[in-house]
Amino acid sequence: MIMGYNLKFLIITIIAISLTDVLAARTYSRRVVLGDERFEEYQPLLQGKRVAVFSNQTGIVGDKVTGSKLADALAEYGGCFPRKRVDEISLIPFTEPSVPGGKIEYGQHIVDALIEKGVDVKAIFSPEHGFRGNADAGEHVSSSVDEKTGVEILSLYEKGSRIPSKEKTDKFDVLVIDIQDVGLRYYTYYITMHHLMEACARDGKQVVILDRPNPNGFYVDGPVLDMKFKSGVGWLPIATVHGMTLGELALMINGEKWLENGTCDLTVVPCLNYTHNTRYSLILPPSPNIKDMRAVYLYSSTCYFEGTVVSLGRGTQFPFETYGHPAMTGYSFSFVPRSIPGAKSPQFLDEECHGVDLRRKPLRDIWAEKINLEYVIDAYRNLNMGDKFFGKNNFFELLAGVDWFRSMIGNGSSAAGISARWASDVENFKSRRAPYLLYPEI
């Protein structure tokens, strides 16, 4: 099935099979089929066209992989978490081979696959962390050439604006998007997608999204962004955990008219055998500091520490799965951030931090809690440093997306009390996003 969004007439058209067929397909296979595997559906859109690709290291067609301990553990379950082994499997690092010293082999990258099939790939756009995914968070990645294919990699971090210039869009007719997101407002890949859609709307280019599952797509939580806090870690008026795939979010961007240049000519190639209740496992890090599936699930709660004086474990092998500070007391656990690839200058470099290890918390508890503010509140009360806890800028507000988080924490509110304040935001956002969902919420 391809769901097409005709931007000139602002209607959604079913190009291939209906959503009913997607539901029926689930009875024949438990394996989720990614949009990029369905070449026969999107090949006509690329034939005879100059193509650019927005992707990174996650753009592996069908998420095919061999030699991976994680992939082996998930193989019999179609890439989804089994009930009995959920906690064990979530702790397996993406990069751990099946056997000690073994090598993990990934399937074809979408760029290689398109070129092999005769598609005229003219350019690659890469997000934060670069095309190969090894740059630090926020690090500016310059234009270059992909060594394997010779295709030009166009930077989105040059000349001030992250919206591609007409000079860059003149290089292609169709933009293909195939990248793994994790479904959070402050996870920046959707922002890059928005900027690319903006440029394509401006210059009359087609956009084809090869959809992928959202590993956090089974719930919606957190406040909707107050647009006075619009920034590079929050660009659209969406909930913190929006529960949408990139394809669905792109449809919403068009439908809600969130592009300054109107709407773009958008087609989404959906996944098969996927629902919003699927616990889909990734096969490799979507960004350098998300090293296993537990980090994917904890990210919505622990990322708030980026806007505080507390470390969330950058510079360790378990970022987003811990938190600590040299001055925190009463904890038996400690860690020491080091300079490592993807975290060259972590907070509290080479200092011992005392705090909490979340790596053994049952995954079902993490799922049930959704966004858990207990971690931030615990650290705030332990350090007892008042507003200095939030650092010298407003980055905490940019992550929170609202101006009342900080004051409620400072006034002694409970995590439940704070989350109750955003409950209406969640319900309103769920209603607003409903027309754009491609997958059942079961």
Task: Tell me the role of every PLM-derived stretch.
Residues 120-128, 210:
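Short internal beta-strands
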Residues 132-137, 208-230:
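Glycine-rich, charge-decorated loop segments at or immediately adjacent to ligand/cofactor-binding or catalytic sites
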